[in-house]
Amino acid sequence: MNFVSLRVITDDVARLVAFYEQVTTVGARWATPEFAELVTPSCTLAVASTGTVALFGADSARPAANRTAIIEFRVADVDAEHRRLAAAGCVFVQEPTTMPWGNRSLLVRDPDGNLVNLFTPVTAEALQRQAR
């Protein structure tokens, strides 16, 4: 089994896609106006409208309702990403901080309030854990 995708449901697909395009520097692939994907080498972030929820069962998902998940992106240099996003006017939940488990992380919220972590493994243990 392979983990391949995370889907975020939103009331405003274009706004959320624009945010993730800015954060990841990956252009979205639009299937329909209600569904787009940002494809990276390791996983795909899908963004879908609330109109697609009925396809999975009525009221099976709601936008901006999840405060338990963190959408995470491993980056080559979190401090460089911080400078790039700060220059673009991004508001940070957490400035770059080295965590006890060896990742240097920064946190932002997407326009729907989902927590987004950009991190770089910086210790030998973290680098080994993140080796692919």
Segments the model singles out, each with a brief description of its role:
Residues M1-S5, V26-E72, H82-R109, P121-R132:
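Vicinal oxygen chelate
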Residues V4-A18:
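Short, basic/low-complexity N-terminal boundary segments at the transition from targeting/disordered tails
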Residues T10, E72-V75:
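Short, solvent-exposed loop/helix junctions and linker helices
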Residues R15, V78-H82:
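Short, conserved charged micro-motifs
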Residues L16-E21, L85, G113:
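Conserved active-site tyrosine of GNAT-family acetyltransferases
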Residues L115-L118:
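Short glycine-/small-residue motifs
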